[in-house]
């Protein structure tokens, strides 16, 4: 892009940010970070390098989220389906996620901004070193309340619902609850994190238009926005457009 083009783009971005700050933003933003591997192939780097670029982009997007006033972000970091990838890639991703958590533990912005870090999903299949790091970062940030950063790891929406049903069934057999007592509020209490509110907006990159087993129970009335760029290529202007689009919709919640 030319210098003039960059100048015009910065002005547009500034004006859009100014407009966004005048109106309510999503309280909870869900993000499906799709396109790391496609990005890598498109510029001739390894897929692992593409994942590293994706990690770097996530740091940017968290900053953008706090800048516009969003207080909760949930990122689809590693799905149950991702376990089916080649073992070398899976192990690389586990190490990359572990590094990301360690970076958070050492990042003064986490403590300055009061960022609580939480993991949702079935972590039983994760390597011990990663489970230990998750325990550390969750414990270290548990007291913070200003901003919440959730990572869905070992997560699948269908599996979450199945696991909830199994736990409910067991409690019925044990006489702890009655079938007639089951309602949406009770069901939510059996999900991986009963404190997780429904996402107001789900942003997906790469141009794919589906939610891919992400927060299936919680996303019943979420607004969806699909950005036609791979995750590492997401620009601040793309992010702001997603928020602006959300602000200009009339949410009906099924009515």
From Swiss-Prot:
Annotated PROSITE patterns: UPP_SYNTHASE
Keyword Transferase on entry: yes
Positions of substrate binding: 35-38, 51, 79-81, 83, 85, 204, 210-212
Record carries keyword Magnesium: yes
Cofactor note: Binds 2 magnesium ions per subunit.
Cofactor dependency: Mg(2+)
Superkingdom of source: Archaea
Record-listed Mg(2+) binding positions: 34, 223
Catalytic reactions of this protein: geranylgeranyl diphosphate + 7 isopentenyl diphosphate = tri-trans,hepta-cis-undecaprenyl diphosphate + 7 diphosphate
GO MF term set: ditrans,polycis-polyprenyl diphosphate synthase [(2E,6E)-farnesyl diphosphate specific] activity; magnesium ion binding
Single Gene Ontology BP annotation: polyprenol biosynthetic process
Keywords: Magnesium, Metal-binding, Transferase
Assigned EC number: 2.5.1.89
Residues annotated as transmembrane: none
Active site feature: 34, 82
Family that this chain belongs to: Belongs to the UPP synthase family.
Known partners and oligomeric status: Homodimer.
Biological role: Catalyzes the sequential condensation of isopentenyl diphosphate (IPP) with geranylgeranyl diphosphate (GGPP) to yield (2Z,6Z,10Z,14Z,18Z,22Z,26Z,30E,34E,38E)-undecaprenyl diphosphate (tritrans,heptacis-UPP). It is probably the precursor of glycosyl carrier lipids.
PANTHER family: DEHYDRODOLICHYL DIPHOSPHATE SYNTHASE COMPLEX SUBUNIT DHDDS, DEHYDRODOLICHYL DIPHOSPHATE SYNTHASE FAMILY MEMBER
Protein's recorded name: Tritrans,polycis-undecaprenyl-diphosphate synthase (geranylgeranyl-diphosphate specific)
Organism annotation: Picrophilus torridus (strain ATCC 700027 / DSM 9790 / JCM 10055 / NBRC 100828 / KAW 2/3)
């Amino acid at each position: 892009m030319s210098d003039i083009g960059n100048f015009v783009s910065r002005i547009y971005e500034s004006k859009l940010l100014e407009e966004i700050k005048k109106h309510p933003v999503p309280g909870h933003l869900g993000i499906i970070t799709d396109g790391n591997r496609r990005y890598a192939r498109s510029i001739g780097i390894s897929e692992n390098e593409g994942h590293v670029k994706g990690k770097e982009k996530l740091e940017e997007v968290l900053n953008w989220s706090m800048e516009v006033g969003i207080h909760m972000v949930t990122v689809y970091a590693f799905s149950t389906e991702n376990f089916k990838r080649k073992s070398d890639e899976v192990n690389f991703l586990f190490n990359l996620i572990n590094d990301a958590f360690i970076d958070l533990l050492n990042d003064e912005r986490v403590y300055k901004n009061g960022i609580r870090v939480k993991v949702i999903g079935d972590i039983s299949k994760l390597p011990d070193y990663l489970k230990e790091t998750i325990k550390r970062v969750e414990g270290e940030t548990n007291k913070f309340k200003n901003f919440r950063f959730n990572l869905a790891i070992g997560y699948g929406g269908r599996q979450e619902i199945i696991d909830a049903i199994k736990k409910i069934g067991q409690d019925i057999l044990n006489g702890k609850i009655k079938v007639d007592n089951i309602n949406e509020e009770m069901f939510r209490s059996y999900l991986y994190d009963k404190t997780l509110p429904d996402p107001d907006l789900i942003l997906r990159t790469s141009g794919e238009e589906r939610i891919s087993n992400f927060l299936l129970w919680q996303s019943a009335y979420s607004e969806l926005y699909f950005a036609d760029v791979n995750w590492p290529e997401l620009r601040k202007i793309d992010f702001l457009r997603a928020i602006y689009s959300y602000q200009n919709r009339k949410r009906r919640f099924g009515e």
